[in-house]
Amino acid sequence: MKTITSTSSMDRTNLLITLILSALLVVLFFAIPDFYPRLILFSLFSVVYVVIYGYNPTSYSLTEDSLLLNSPYKKISISLNEISAAQYLGKSNAFSMIRTFGSSGIFGHWGYFYSPRIGKVKLYARRNNHWILIHTLHRGKYIIAPDDPSFFDELQSRLLIEKVE
């Protein structure tokens, strides 16, 4: 089986939130008259933006035996044997979830969240649609959001093949 990859791009909502927050930071930067507080603000938010961007997914890949969540800093590999179920959630809203650690809004959603409906979940999504909930045997639940909705169908077929073999 060949490797299937789907990009992970921001939808309009997350792009708008990122642009608005960035614009507010620029306004705040110029509103501070003193150099050192301005430098501290710039340094702090530069680090925050770089960290958040680095952990947000850029793509998802299905290899012969694993699902890969690719980000600039880290590649998370989940063995297909480890996945017990995958469920297509479609359009969802991370803002209805409780963020326990991570980021929501700037460059998408990344981190640990809690949902009364789903429970604890690790969210790696740059968009609010095409959400796929992945249940693993020992690593908890993940939500991913590939750009290509057919990625879910390919994941399901590989999970079925994996279980038959």
Regions found by a protein language model. Give the residues of each.
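Short, aromatic-rich membrane-interface segments at the entry and exit
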Residues: 34-42
